[in-house]
Structure formats: structure tokens, C-alpha cells
Amino acid sequence: MGKGDKTHINIVVIGHVDSGKSTTTGHLIYKCGGIDKRTIEKFEKEAQEMGKGSFKYAWVLDKLKAERERGITIDIALWKFETAKFYVTIIDAPGHRDFIKNMITGTSQADCAVLVVACGTGEFEAGISKNGQTREHALLAQTLGVKQMIVACNKMDSTEPPFSEKRFDEIVTEVKSFLKKVGYNPATIPFVPISGFNGDNMLEPSSNMSWYKGWSVERKEGNASGKTLIEALDCIIPPQRPTDRPLRLPLQDVYKIGGIGTVPVGRVETGVIKPGMVVTFAPQNVTTEVKSVEMHHESLPEASPGDNVGFNVKNVSVKDIRRGSVCSDSKNDPAKESKNFTAQVIVMNHPGQISAGYTPVLDCHTAHIACKFAELKEKVDRRTGKSTEASPKFLKSGDAGIVELIPTKPPCVESFTDYAPLGRFAVRDMRQTVAVGVIKSVTKDDGSGGKVTKSAAKKK
């Protein structure tokens, strides 16, 4: 395979706060990644000076995180690494304050979640307890449609005795049982005993665990087996990018560029956009023609899902459209404004309870929407989705329910089954994510009488 031929995949690393996510991720980036020798040497020197000689790999990530949180745009290559088959981008790792929000409004959808659990005595139990984040992260991944999972059983070097087969088996049994409850099929999940710190079973089979015969998975796309974490990553089933769906492109920004005009910028979520196409922006219901499409300052004949593009539109002012607007093909299921919508929400960390009338802010794709919980229709079992109570008075942390939401100003959202990236949202209140949801159905405005530019009218 030539260098340019590898498929790009996105992973998200999840697990309890002390499970060793940073060390494990850092190890992969360090050994297979985009960090050049000079940077590593610089980090190592700093670590030694600070007396963090044992920094190993987490330090790499701490540096990157600190820079990312200070808003320094760091070279995104630092979050990438390569396997035999894939270019892997780590789209986020928790511990980051906005992790949950990021995972939902996701700059992109993760193709696979790597769940890191710590196997040290007492550590695993803490992570999986009622208050541990292990379950919450796994549930979140499942709710947001991350279909594939790999479990890295970390810190095998600190079990009693070290590298204990008995402890590994015990943990695998436990994790399988709760992943099943969340909705994953354990037969499709590789379980790999590793030490992210020492490197056991990360890239090469470990001589410390000769008892480990390897992982194997059964799935309709074909069975697979291997011994190491990197091999498990290599067996991820690459996603089908949704080029055949109608266009949906949520805007991140709209620029006015002298001599060119209005340039909306955003990421193609579904479908394709190309010059000459007549597009409609919702909820504003503005229709115009695309003059050109650019990515990284080069003009493109067309852009497809995953591409971050800027495109030039004719006779539309910067005042007409804004961040959160959605661009669509006016001739193929154009996007419309959403009057109200029904969603399934899971309440995560709300200190009190949510009842009808509650009006928080929803983050859905690039839009920021004030919304009223108009009606709590039913409480449902999180795992099965079956109704457990009709018209509940309130929902509290841990509950899931079907609710009717009415936005204060109509946005453009879609049902999760039609356009997944536009159908997931985070409910934000008190500066944190209090619930997550997926949209089941949307009442749309038929949107007659919008603005149509001359060039668009000509093409109709």
C-alpha cells in the first residue's frame, strides 16, 4: 500500500479517570505517531528538569492537552498515529472538560471507542462502581452510535501477582456483562491485557503473559483475531462514509472576503457539495448558487463527508446566514427549519430534577439552541428503550425519557436515523453537560416564501 492509500479512521478513548488513558494513548502516538524525534527529546528534557523522569508517555499527552486547552492550535498531527492499515485520529480523550459535549457535537463521529480499564487491585472496582465513569462513557458511546469497541485491560503490571491471568479473566467477565447491558455484543469486542506504561501487548506480544492466547472476535463482516492492541485497531471495520445521502453541511462560520464575497465554512456531514449546485440554507430558508468550493486553499470539483470546506455563494450577505445554519441541496430533500422535536434523552449529572418547562441550551451540530422541555412523554429503560412510566412528573440523573422539545427560535435539526450528525445533542446547564439525547422525529416548517437569489432562480 502506498502512503496515501490508507483509510482514515477516528477513535475516541474512554474510561475512568485513573485508568491510564493518557499513558496508553501517549504510547501509541509516541511509537507510531506524528510526533517527531525533536519534539520528544524536548519533552523528555523538560520532564527530567521537572523531576518527572518517569514521565514515560502521559507527559506527551499532558503537554498536548495543556496547549489545546490554552487555545494554542497545536499541530493536529500530534493526535494521529498509524497502523498497518489505517491513519488513526484520536478525536478526543476524556478528562478534557468538554469531552461529553465534544463527543456529541463531535467534530466528527468516532468509528470505534477504545475503553481503557485499570486492572490494579481496587482500581477496576473504583472505575466500574456506581460513581465511576466507565459505565457512563460506554453508555454514551452506545447512545451516540459508536458501534465498535475495543477493551484495553491496562496496568496488568500492577495486578497481584503481576500479569495475573485470573485477574484478567475476572475483569473480562465483569466488563462483558456491563457492556451487554449497555447494548454492545461482547463477541464482537477484542479484550487485550496491556501495560500502557511498559508496552506489554501494545505493539508486540508480551513475554510477561505467555498464558494469553490472544483475542478473537466474531462478526458478520468477518471474524478476526490477534494478540496486541495495535492489531485490534487494525481490525476496525472502516465506516461507509455517507456520500449517497442528501447534502447536510452545518456552518461553523461565515466570512466576508473582499473581492470574493460571502464564504460559509463547515464540515460536510452527508452528501456532496460542488460548484454550480443550488443550495438552501435552513432555518433562514435562503437559496443560492455555489460558485466554488475550497479546501486548504485549493479549489475542489466536489467535497464529500468529512471534508472541512469553505465555499463561495452568490448574492447572500453575511447577515443572511450564520453559524449553526445548515446548507443542503435545494433539489434533494432540502433542510428546513424545525418547529419542535421529540427526543430520547439520558440525564447524566443534573443535581436536581428535570420537569416540564425546563429551558436549558442544546448543543446540536454547530448550533446553540435554547429549548423548552415542553412535555415529558414517558420514562424508558435505558437499555431496552421500553417504556416504564407514562407522563412522568420529572426525570433525574440516571433516568432516560422521551420528551417533546420546543426551541425558542427555530433551528435546523434532523432525526438521528435520517442524518445522525444532526440528530445528537448535549443539554448544557450550569456550565456542564446535564443530559444527552438523540432526536426521534422533527416537525418541520414547509418554508415557502424564502429568499431566492437571481442566479438560483435561473437554474431552477
Swiss-Prot record:
It is found in: Cytoplasm. Pfam families: GTP-eEF1A_C, GTP_EFTU, GTP_EFTU_D2. Residues 195-197 are annotated as: G5. Residues 6-243 form the tr-type G domain. Residues 15-22 are annotated as: G1. Coiled coil: none annotated. Keywords: Cytoplasm, Elongation factor, GTP-binding, Nucleotide-binding, Phosphoprotein, Protein biosynthesis. GO terms for molecular function: GTP binding; GTPase activity; translation elongation factor activity. InterPro entries: EFTu-like_2, G_TR_CS, GTP-eEF1A_C, P-loop_NTPase, T_Tr_GTP-bd_dom, TRAFAC_GTPase_members, Transl_B-barrel_sf, Transl_elong_EF1A/Init_IF2_C. Residues 92-95 are annotated as: G3. Residues 154-157 are annotated as: G4. It comes from the Eukaryota. The modification 5-glutamyl glycerylphosphorylethanolamine is found at E302, E375. One of its GO terms (cellular component) is cytoplasm. Residues 71-75 are annotated as: G2. This protein promotes the GTP-dependent binding of aminoacyl-tRNA to the A-site of ribosomes during protein biosynthesis. NCBIfam families: EF-1_alpha, PRK12317.1. Belongs to the TRAFAC class translation factor GTPase superfamily. Classic translation factor GTPase family. EF-Tu/EF-1A subfamily. This is Elongation factor 1-alpha 3.
